[in-house]
Each structure stands twice: as C-alpha cells, then as structure tokens.
C-alpha cells in the first residue's frame, strides 16, 4: 500500500481537537474520538462521570476511557530526538498553542474554549509568528531606509564642513595678500577682517560639528536597534511573541 501523507499533514491529524497540539496522554472515549487526558479532565473536572464528546456531542462514560496506545506509539515514533518541551498554560497545563488577538497574549486551547478568553478572536501561534515576522521585516526595511538617510546627511554635513574650511582658507590667503600690499596703514583693518572671518568660520564649523555628532549618534542607535531586531527573529515562537509584543507596546 502506498503512503502519500506528508509529515505536516500527519502532524495535523495527530492534534487534539481541544488544545490543537499533538496528543499528550491520549484517551479514547467510547464514541471513538481521542483527546489529551489533561483536556478531558479540564473539560469535565474528573473522568468518573458522564462526559459529552466535544466532537460528536455523544454522552459517554468517562470512566471507560482507555489510553489510545496505538496513537501514543505513532506520536512517539514520529517525535524528533531533542524536541523541546512546549511551554504550557499556567491555568490548564496545556501547550500555549493560540494567541488571543483581543488581549494580546498566548493562551491554550482550553483558555479559548472555556476560560477567560472564550469568544475572543484567536490565531494559531505559528500564524501569529509568521505575521509578526512580516512586521519585523517591514520594520527592518524602514530601519535600513532611515540608516540610508542618516548616511546621506552625514556625507552632506562632512562635504559642507570641508567646503567651508577650504573657502575660509582661500579667503584668508586673498586677504593676507591684499593687506600685505597696504602694509602698516591698514594693519588694524586687516586684523579685524581676519578675526571676523575666523569667528564666523568657527561658528559654522561648530554648528556643523554638533549636527555631525548628533547624526552619528542617531546612526549608532539605529545600528543597535538593527541588532536587536535581528536577535528577535532568532527567538523561538513564544519568546519572540512575548518580546515583540513588549517592544511594540512601548
């Protein structure tokens, strides 16, 4: 018999209908549907009474639920060595598989089904992570554009500073030559003019130096922000969403 089911499709079929994560301690109800043991306990508080199946709504005896050994064996066989344990909800101890769009926080399937996030718009963590990474890419692009603008500003300031200094040198040389011809009768006037040009030049250069220093500081901060954004992209889904949401809210 040929098998044509991809690993991703198989993983989708091995998910608990309640928490939307791969089965953990799966139990099979009398109706044939399987759920995580923790999900069933959270749904009915205990398994010694009648349980209504969330899939077919058939009322079955919870105490007759047996471990789905075959399903557990398949999941264990497909599990990659070294897979990290998923982060779990502090209320239901189920994997944080969903993101509440209204409250902007990670939740488990039971939080969205029965808890305080009931009826809130929710999105799978993988989808939210992809969306936020797209936002991160857009932010990264904007950062690059800002860096380009700052680089252009720095180049312009450096060019203007060089031009002003060079022009000042030329003007000073011309003035010295002219006043050398007049010698003593105009020495006082020459000194006054030179001082005026020097003072004006120092003022312009000081202003440009200040702008240059500010622009270089802005460039350094943008470079630091770029590094932070690149590090965010390497975080796991949950750390990335927590940190990205914390950064975006500031």
UniProtKB/Swiss-Prot annotation:
Zinc finger (B box-type): 84-125
Gene Ontology cellular-component annotations: cytoplasm; cytosol
Zinc fingers (RING-type) by residue: 16-57
InterPro entries: TRIM/RBCC, Znf-RING_euk, Znf_B-box, Znf_RING, Znf_RING/FYVE/PHD, Znf_RING_CS
Molecular function GO labels: ubiquitin protein ligase activity; zinc ion binding
Pfam (any one): zf-RING_UBOX
Entry superkingdom: Eukaryota
Gene Ontology annotations of biological process type: innate immune response
Organism of origin: Homo sapiens
Coiled coil: 125-169, 204-235
Positions annotated to bind Zn(2+): 89, 92, 111, 117
Gene symbol of the encoding locus: TRIM73
Protein name: Tripartite motif-containing protein 73
Family: Belongs to the TRIM/RBCC family.
Keywords attached to this entry: Coiled coil, Metal-binding, Zinc, Zinc-finger
Keyword DNA repair belongs to the record: no
């Amino acid at each position: 018999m040929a098998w044509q089911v991809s690993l991703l499709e198989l993983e989708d079929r091995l998910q608990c209908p309640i928490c939307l994560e791969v089965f953990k301690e799966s139990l099979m109800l009398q109706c044939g549907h399987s759920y995580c043991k923790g999900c069933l306990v959270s749904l009915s508080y205990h398994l010694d009474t009648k349980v209504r199946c969330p899939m077919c709504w058939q009322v079955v005896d919870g105490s007759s639920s047996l471990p789905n050994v075959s399903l557990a064996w398949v999941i264990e066989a497909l599990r990659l060595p070294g897979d990290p344990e998923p982060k779990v909800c502090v209320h239901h101890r189920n994997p944080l598989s969903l993101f509440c769009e209204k409250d902007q926080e990670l939740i488990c399937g039971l939080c969205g089904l029965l808890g305080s996030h009931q009826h809130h718009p929710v999105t799978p963590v993988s989808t939210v992570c992809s969306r936020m990474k797209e936002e991160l890419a857009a932010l990264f692009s904007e950062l690059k554009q800002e860096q380009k603008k700052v680089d252009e500003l720095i180049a312009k300031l450096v060019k203007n500073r060089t031009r002003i200094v060079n022009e000042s040198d030329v003007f000073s040389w011309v003035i010295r030559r002219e006043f050398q011809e007049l010698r003593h009768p105009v020495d006082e006037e020459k000194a006054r003019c030179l001082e005026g040009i020097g003072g004006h030049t120092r003022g312009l250069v000081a202003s440009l130096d200040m702008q240059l220093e500010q622009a270089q500081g802005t460039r350094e901060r943008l470079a630091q922000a770029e590094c932070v954004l690149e590090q965010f992209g390497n975080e796991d889904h949950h750390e990335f969403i927590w940190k990205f949401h914390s950064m975006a809210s500031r």
